[in-house]
Curated annotation (Swiss-Prot):
Annotated residues for binding of ATP: 10-17
Quaternary structure (record): Monomer.
Enzyme Commission code(s) on record: 2.5.1.75
Binding positions for substrate per the UniProt entry: 12-17
Keyword rRNA-binding applies: no
Keyword vocabulary terms for this entry: ATP-binding, Magnesium, Nucleotide-binding, Transferase, tRNA processing
Lineage of producing organism: Bacteria, Bacillati, Bacillota, Bacilli, Lactobacillales
Annotated positions for site Interaction with substrate tRNA: 101, 127
Protein name per Swiss-Prot or TrEMBL: tRNA dimethylallyltransferase
Molecular function in Gene Ontology: ATP binding; tRNA dimethylallyltransferase activity
Catalyzed reactions: adenosine(37) in tRNA + dimethylallyl diphosphate = N(6)-dimethylallyladenosine(37) in tRNA + diphosphate
Gene encoding the protein: miaA
Family: Belongs to the IPP transferase family.
Organism this protein belongs to: Streptococcus thermophilus (strain ATCC BAA-491 / LMD-9)
């Protein structure tokens, strides 16, 4: 029998953390972070990490598991998430994965072994084709496909496109999970308004100080490449004004949200819910109760 689990996915700033905690309280669950940036200790504001109060309301896994100068990959996530799921289920609780890193979630749920065998001649031919494209053409291709990459540079863009193109040929082991994937969504303009408001709130909470510490000490680390930090570095170096840097941060976050939605719509089987609907989140809870074969709110 496959292990049932819940996934709360969607773009940034739609309330995934709040819903995850509510579901954990209602369905006797524990949360596994599915966010590539929240693994880093000391990076709390820019990653929109669950606050100490929120973490006290529900047990969280895969938060604060790496130092800021360490790397983290989809393989690391799958390995550690599988261990967390086994632990949670062994204690009679429900695993609830909350996050917006589509590649991580897909790799876990669909059983892809990222090191699987692919016809290398096909890969090389496709790579040669990509090498003929300009940087702008590569980045436009990345954006149109909704692919998430940590850093916008040519090498990473080509590698990401190769993975996207040949993912169906990777070794696909039978997954042992039966997920119910909740996708949170809203009108695009409302999501963008929430993003802009959240960036302003992050600044009030100390984002500039957090980003400056990262800039001064670990500017070349993988953790520093995430949206929320790198946009502020030109301000610290004197290349941009604060207003220019913050506008760039908001713009990049909005674009990232668009890519996240594209990924979840095109690459995963998701049940979407409009967060501005009067029926939200009651409709989510009702659907989960049916999925879990239990009466609403009981465990």
């Amino acid at each position: 029998m496959k292990t049932k689990l819940i996934v709360v996915a969607g773009p940034t700033a739609v309330g995934k953390t709040a819903l995850g905690i509510e579901l954990a309280e209602r369905f006797n669950g524990e949360i596994i972070s599915g966010d590539s940036q929240q693994v880093y200790r000391q990076l709390n504001i820019g990653t929109a990490k669950a606050t100490p109060e929120e973490q006290a309301a529900a047990v969280h896994h895969l938060i604060d598991v790496r130092d800021v100068d360490e790397s983290y990959s989809a393989y690391d996530f799958v390995t550690e998430a599988q261990a967390a799921i086994t632990d949670i289920v062994s204690r009679g609780k429900l695993p609830i994965i909350v996050g917006g890193t589509g590649l991580y979630l897909q790799s876990l749920l669909e059983g892809y072994h990222l090191g699987g065998q692919v016809d290398q001649n096909q890969v090389l031919a496709y790579r040669s084709e990509l090498e003929q494209l300009s940087d702008q053409q590569l980045f436009e291709k990345i954006d149109s496909l909704g692919i998430e990459i940590k850093e916008i540079n040519r090498r990473r863009a080509i590698r990401a496109l190769e993975l996207y193109r040949f993912s169906d040929n990777l070794e696909n082991t039978e997954t042992c999970y039966e997920p119910f994937i909740i996708g949170l969504d809203d009108e695009r303009s409302l999501i963008y308004d929430r993003i802009n408001t959240r960036v302003d709130k992050m600044v009030e909470l100390g984002l500039l100080e957090e980003a400056k510490w990262l800039y001064d000490n670990f500017s070349e680390a993988q953790s520093a490449r995430g949206i929320g930090y790198k946009e502020l570095f030109p301000y610290f170096s004197g290349e941009q004004t604060l207003d220019e840097a913050l506008e760039k941060l908001k713009q990049n976050t909005r674009r990232f949200a668009k890519r996240q939605l594209t990924w979840f719509r095109n690459r995963m089987t998701v049940s979407f819910y409009q967060i501005s609907s009067p029926e939200y989140p009651e409709n989510v809870i009702q659907d989960l109760a049916i999925f879990l074969n239990e009466e609403e709110g009981e465990k």
